[in-house]
């Protein structure tokens, strides 16, 4: 079967071995050796050979000694979660509108801040891991610690940054980015379908609004699976979220769902349980296990942030909507304990890198730890926390955006003081059909209307 997607068939297969081990499947040594012996050039497009090995992998089961409980269905997830607030009292309309404006603005600021160094944060440069490379880049320009947008200034150190429209010399709006695109998509879905939307509505909206070349990793695989299994001329009941999330999708516990949490948190402001449910519908067809839980957790945190202004309480609100014995919950609970003894964000990140540095730079768990650490050590100060989230490395624009979104919901735009807000001119220019250019003020108004509709449904 011819199947690619985000990367070559061989690359997908190699990532699949890593993913299977992570989710508790013991890959036989003979299969692992066969894959290791394949040449990255001569075998990368060998569909038949890769298919044959994939068939062997499909028969493997999770080990009985795997210590985690990581259910897939929403019903099972709810049974496995701890107690939590589920829902808070309503907020004054005038305050809520300001908080929506703050959340959209915070998301854009954090995204733009991290965008030029996303590649550096994930892959590192010049022999340095991401966080160290970012620090060296900033120090070489006398910009450490991070306090404003990255400069594209060439000082002869051979570091490379990207996205000139998000650099301090040029920034005038929020440029296209998937972290913003999916928040816009969530808004469009809730506007059109209300609270009863399904995962199929989401897939259809992607097809209608998102160019394939702006979709990455797990999302690339899932939408390809969906379209390959769905006749163009009619709807198909055959394709399932189990198929779209699993078939040739080794990225199913990466960060792609986690960055899609925000819109559901906005639409369900004050209702973490419903926000997590909406996030589940969004994640279940592209991700599995901790990939799903990451989106559910942050949707719940964002929904709670409209009412709660304590970082530990917010983290626990998020944890109350995911299984208590999953890898993400375990990591976050360990992080809360480390926050009691690590004196600052940088020593905290030393621990994160030591214990979770073997994960891919765009995995759900390690990046979630960056965000919650930035919230805690930044003491919910918008400017400082967002800068920490980007300094932490790995997926810098995603983490900056999530952190900024939470803080915007906590404070509202009128209470957010940052030199990084004015340069965006309240404007987003995305690559989403139907949102070619729009102000964050308008997005806040539309989000408020969606919130009222869902609340009253």
Residue ranges and their predicted role:
Residues 1-457:
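Structured, active/binding-site neighborhoods that engage oxygen-rich ligands
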């Amino acid at each position: 079967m011819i199947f690619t997607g985000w990367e070559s068939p061989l690359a997908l297969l190699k990532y699949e071995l890593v993913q299977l081990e992570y989710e508790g499947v013991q890959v036989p040594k003979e299969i692992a050796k066969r894959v290791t012996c394949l040449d990255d050039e001569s075998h990368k497009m060998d569909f038949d050979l890769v298919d044959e090995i994939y068939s062997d992998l499909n028969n493997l089961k999770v080990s009985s000694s795997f210590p985690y409980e990581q259910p897939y269905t929403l019903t099972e997830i709810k049974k496995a979660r701890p107690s939590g607030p589920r829902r808070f009292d309503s907020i004054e309309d005038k305050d809520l509108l300001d908080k929506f404006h703050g959340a959209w603005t915070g998301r854009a600021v954090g995204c733009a801040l991290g965008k030029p160094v996303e590649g550096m944060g994930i892959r590192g440069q010049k022999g340095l891991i991401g966080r160290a490379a970012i620090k060296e880049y900033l120090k070489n320009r006398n910009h450490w610690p991070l306090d404003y947008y990255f400069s594209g200034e060439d000082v002869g150190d051979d570091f490379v940054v990207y996205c000139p429209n998000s650099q301090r010399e040029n920034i005038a709006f929020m440029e296209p980015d998937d972290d913003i695109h999916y928040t816009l998509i969530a808004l469009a879905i809730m506007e059109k379908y209300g609270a009863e939307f399904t995962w199929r509505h989401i897939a259809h909206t992607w097809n209608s609004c998102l160019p394939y070349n702006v979709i990455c990793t797990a999302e690339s695989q899932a939408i390809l699976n969906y379209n390959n299994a769905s006749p163009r001329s009619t709807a198909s009941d055959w394709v399932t979220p189990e198929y779209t999330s699993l078939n040739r999708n080794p990225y199913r516990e990466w960060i792609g769902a986690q960055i899609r949490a925000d819109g559901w948190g906005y639409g369900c402001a004050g209702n973490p349980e419903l926000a997590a449910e909406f996030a589940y519908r969004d994640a279940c067809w592209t991700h599995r296990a901790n990939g799903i839980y990451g989106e559910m957790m942050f949707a719940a945190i964002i929904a709670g942030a409209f009412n709660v202004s304590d970082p530990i309480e917010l983290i626990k609100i998020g944890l109350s909507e995911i299984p208590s014995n999953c890898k993400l919950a375990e990591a976050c609970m360990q992080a809360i304990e480390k926050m009691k003894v690590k004196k600052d964000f940088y020593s905290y990140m030393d621990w994160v890198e030591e214990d979770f540095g073997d994960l891919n730079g765009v995995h759900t768990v390690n990046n979630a730890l960056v965000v919650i650490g930035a919230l805690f050590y930044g003491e919910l100060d918008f400017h400082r926390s967002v800068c920490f989230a980007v300094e932490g490395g790995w997926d810098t624009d995603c983490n900056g955006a999530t952190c900024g979104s939470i803080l915007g919901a906590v404070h509202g735009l009128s209470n957010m003081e940052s030199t990084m807000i004015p340069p965006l001119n309240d404007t987003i220019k995305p690559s989403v059909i139907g949102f070619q250019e729009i102000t964050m003020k308008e997005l806040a108004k539309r989000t408020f209307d969606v919130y009222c509709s869902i609340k009253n449904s």
